[in-house]
Amino acid sequence: MKIQVGGLSDGIHQYRFQIDPAELGLSENFTEDAIVEASLDKSSNQFLLKSTIRVSGTFDCDRCISRFPRMLQSSYQMYYVTEGADHGLNDPAEIQVIPNGLTVIDISDDVRQTILLSIPLKLLCNDGCKGLCPHCGANLNNGRCTCSTTSDDLRWEKLAVLQKKNLNDRS
């Protein structure tokens, strides 16, 4: 995804890109093209790019391992400043210095990184996902499993007696 900046007039310019995630080196989890809507504000020797990215994917739930679809949406902004220009900006993470005379800015890598950072650390099919039974592996979202709920671990026997007594006292 390249934005032509050579000869671009000062002001705000709108762009829309549609790209196959495979072209960005993203995994087979992404099922549809990514949509990138960008606004580029040019003023003399600097460019402010604000982008919103939407992409659909199919992921495995971290609790129940079921496949589920998810729409990811994320935004980022980046300042592109020509070499030697005084930009007056404090956050170097959002600044890229570009050579004088550059005519094209390639935003592919920034878009790729933004998509990867928008994937949650813990992917859940839904907030109430019950996961898998730790004994038999049954998906608890589909109903109860047939495992015994009693424990044969005698270390917890006295605690079970106290719990039962506490429940009886409340009644």
Q: What label would you give each PLM region?
A:
Residues 1-171:
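Structured interface patches
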